[in-house]
């Protein structure tokens, strides 16, 4: 899989795309009570944070997660507005190269 460093999503585009995918699939993958909680609390305490892919993704995918091309977006709620997300609803792995659409999600259990 050949990828181009000059054809990547920006960090903001990556966050936006991950959040859009999360919203589209949340109803089918989260407990209904979690969906209600997230929707009620998101404006005050919700967020999405961008990271390099964590090591444990290797248990779920069988390809190289080069941080130049892959990002992990954590979506959830924080204790306080602007705080660190500690109530995680989904971890989204995205390929940032625009010609290689790839997404894996680990949902809250």
UniProtKB/Swiss-Prot annotation:
State the source organism's domain of life: Bacteria
Q: Which NCBIfam families does the protein's record reference? A: PRK05094.1
InterPro entries associated with the record = dsDNA_mimic_put, Put_dsDNA_mimic_sf
Describe the task this protein carries out.
May act as a double-stranded DNA (dsDNA) mimic. Probably regulates the activity of a dsDNA-binding protein.
- Species of origin reads Enterobacter sp. (strain 638)
Matches recorded under Pfam families: DUF440
User: Which family is it part of?
Assistant: Belongs to the putative dsDNA mimic protein family.
Task: Provide the protein name.
Answer: Putative double-stranded DNA mimic protein Ent638_2296
